[in-house]
Every structure is written in structure tokens, then in C-alpha cells.
UniProtKB/Swiss-Prot annotation:
Source species: Sulfurimonas denitrificans (strain ATCC 33889 / DSM 1251) (Thiomicrospira denitrificans (strain ATCC 33889 / DSM 1251))
A Pfam family matched in the record: IGPD
Cited HAMAP family: HisB (MF_00076)
InterPro entries from the UniProt entry: IGPD_sf (IPR038494), ImidazoleglycerolP_deHydtase (IPR000807), ImidazoleglycerP_deHydtase_CS (IPR020565), Ribosomal_Su5_D2-typ_SF (IPR020568)
Protein family: Belongs to the imidazoleglycerol-phosphate dehydratase family.
Gene (name only): hisB
Pathway(s) this gene product operates in, as recorded in its UniProt entry: Amino-acid biosynthesis; L-histidine biosynthesis; L-histidine from 5-phospho-alpha-D-ribose 1-diphosphate: step 6/9
Record's keyword annotation contains Lyase: yes
The name this protein goes by in its record: Imidazoleglycerol-phosphate dehydratase
Reaction(s) this enzyme catalyzes, per UniProt: D-erythro-1-(imidazol-4-yl)glycerol 3-phosphate = 3-(imidazol-4-yl)-2-oxopropyl phosphate + H2O
Source organism phylogeny: Bacteria, Pseudomonadati, Campylobacterota, Epsilonproteobacteria, Campylobacterales
Protein EC: 4.2.1.19
Keywords of this entry: Amino-acid biosynthesis, Cytoplasm, Histidine biosynthesis, Lyase
GO molecular function annotation: imidazoleglycerol-phosphate dehydratase activity
Example GO biological process: L-histidine biosynthetic process
Length: 190
């Protein structure tokens, strides 16, 4: 496992991960719904993940959610690059009851996020617009091109969980070892 910490006036975060793990997790962000999503992300990506966060959640969850995405993304990039002997591209359509979310991604070292999941409101006390903030912070710092698209769904919890699982499975597929591909780019570098 490798680790990274970040401390600001708003948050104090430590993240450890192993991209070649078994999907074990120990998550304590101070944001219960995010803990649930990150546990699911770890399980379905097979990335071992430990996260602790103490944040100013008495204000709201925004700083904690975004800063966790920043630290997790930066640590993921540290573990991943340079990409070699991996598939590089990954896709997943994840169904959770009535909800279906797709994720297509490229371990390109070029960050870009397309997020077409139009949600408003809350799941419990969790503001649903924070999901986009998390993924934007993660993708920009992980330096991956990622498209997350809601195909259908009504239940906010199901939609968000399907999104986290779709990203997780797409990452697992993109990180699949393939010794034949070498550096998976015609540029011979990523």
C-alpha cells in the first residue's frame, strides 16, 4: 500500500491504496453515505483502500467530499503511471434495480470528465450534487478521461451507487494486466 495525506484548515485526510488489491476497505470519512459509496468502489474495483478524514462537516460535507477526491485521485495517479502492460480502456454498464449508469474511461494521463447524471436533492443528509464534485476532483487528479452517463433511473441512492460501481468496474477492466500491449499508445508513452 502507498499513502498520501493532506491537511488544510477544512480537512485532514489520509488515504492508502493498493491498485493490485482484493477490494478490502476501511473507510471513515465522517460522511456516512460517502463511506458506503467508497466501500462499494473498493469492492468492485479490487483496489484496497483505507481512508480517514476529519472535516468541517458542521458546515457541510462539500470540503470533505471534494478533498477526498483530490487525495484519492493524486494517490491513484502515483500508483498507476506510467501505464504499461495494462488494457488502458475500460467500460461498464451497472444496473441497480431500476437504475443503470455507464462509465467509459481511458487511463490516458489526460484528465477530462463528462458527467451526465442530472440529480438534485439529498440521499439522507448527503447532497447529491457532491457526487459530481467528488468525481471531478478524482478524475482531474488521477489524470484519467472519464464519461459517466445515467441511462435511466429514479431512486437517487440507486443511481449514485450504480455510478460508483460503474467507475469501479471500468477502472478494474482498464487496469487489467496484458503483457502483450506494452505501452498502450501509438505515441509510445502516456
Amino acid at each position: 500500500m502507498i499513502s498520501k495525506s493532506r491537511k488544510t484548515k477544512e480537512t485532514d485526510i489520509t488515504v492508502s491504496l493498493d491498485i493490485n488489491g482484493n477490494g478490502k476497505s476501511k473507510i471513515d470519512t465522517g460522511v456516512g453515505f460517502l463511506d458506503h459509496m467508497l466501500d462499494s468502489f473498493s469492492k468492485h474495483s479490487l483496489i484496497d483502500l483505507e481512508i480517514t478524514c476529519k472535516g468541517d462537516t458542521h458546515i457541510d460535507d462539500h470540503h470533505s467530499v471534494e478533498d477526498i477526491g483530490i487525495v484519492l485521485g493524486a494517490l491513484f495517479a502515483e500508483a498507476l503511471y506510467p501505464v504499461s502492460n495494462m488494457e488502458r480502456f475500460g467500460s461498464a454498464n451497472i444496473v441497480m434495480d431500476e437504475a443503470c449508469v455507464s462509465c467509459d474511461l481511458d487511463l490516458s494521463n489526460r484528465p477530462y470528465l463528462v458527467y451526465e447524471v442530472n440529480l438534485a436533492g439529498k440521499v439522507g443528509q448527503f447532497d447529491t450534487e457532491l457526487v459530481e464534485e467528488f468525481f471531478r476532483a478524482f478524475v482531474l487528479n488521477a489524470r484519467i478521461s472519464t464519461h459517466i452517463v445515467l441511462q435511466r433511473g429514479k431512486n437517487r441512492h440507486h443511481i449514485i451507487e450504480a455510478a460508483f460501481k460503474a467507475v469501479a468496474v471500468a477502472l478494474r477492466r482498464a487496469m487489467q494486466k496484458n503483457e502483450r500491449v506494452g505501452i498502450p499508445s501509438t505515441k509510445d508513452m502516456l
